[in-house]
Amino acid sequence: KIKNLYFCFIYQFPIMKNIFLSMLVLAIITSCSKDQVDLTVFNPELTIVENLNNDVSILDLIEAVGLEALYGLEFGGGFIFNVNSTSGELMVARDYSIIGGVAWGDHFDLNTGSTIGDGLESTQLIVDRNADDNSLVLGGFEFGSDNYAFKIALDLELDGFDDWFIPSSGSLEAIYNNVHMYGEGDFDESLIYWSSTKDGYFPYVMFFNFESWGGQAFAGSCLDANGLVIARKF
């Protein structure tokens, strides 16, 4: 028995030791190989959103899957509705009407942009002008509080993001055409939504219901209370 134990220690333990060392080396090599995989390179085995979460560049994604494949995807707090094919900038939007209909704000004369991408600048401009005493301007009056669409959006912190704004009329139309028309997004067809586009005393608004001027912005009234679409770009 002692002799058998001797042979067990001499012959079996070194074999087990070698097996263990071999497995350890293999594990290290495998781990190193995994560490060398660049997750920021487009991986066709992953979804587009998974690639986005891995910080794959937008331009690489466009080259791999095409620009339109990104429309309607939920990412970055909203649904992608515009992609800049030169810079890779994304614009996303979502419904924020859970708070109910909200006012436009003070009544005053102002012109703001209508093209895609104008929303952030226009939202800030509207908030700045609301800070003035608009009871003194021709045809103007004071709303009387900060509980109005553009201030709400600019101050909002939602899903870890604090750079929200009200999109322009052109952006609302792009949201309708690139997202809502394909059954994506969370936009309410029963609501009229504010845009950040204004022509003089007339703010532009839009329905998402095809039977009621759906997808086409039109002049509304600052006296109304409407729903909110909020957007961000990054």
What is the predicted function of each stretch?
Residues 19-29:
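Sec-dependent N-terminal signal peptides
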Residues 93, 166-167:
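GIY-YIG nuclease signature motif recognition
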Residues 15-19, 33-34:
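Positively charged n-region of N-terminal signal peptides that target proteins for export
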Residues 88-90, 164, 191:
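Structural motif
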Residues 1-15:
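Short, Lys/Arg-enriched N-terminal segments with co-localized hydrophobic residues
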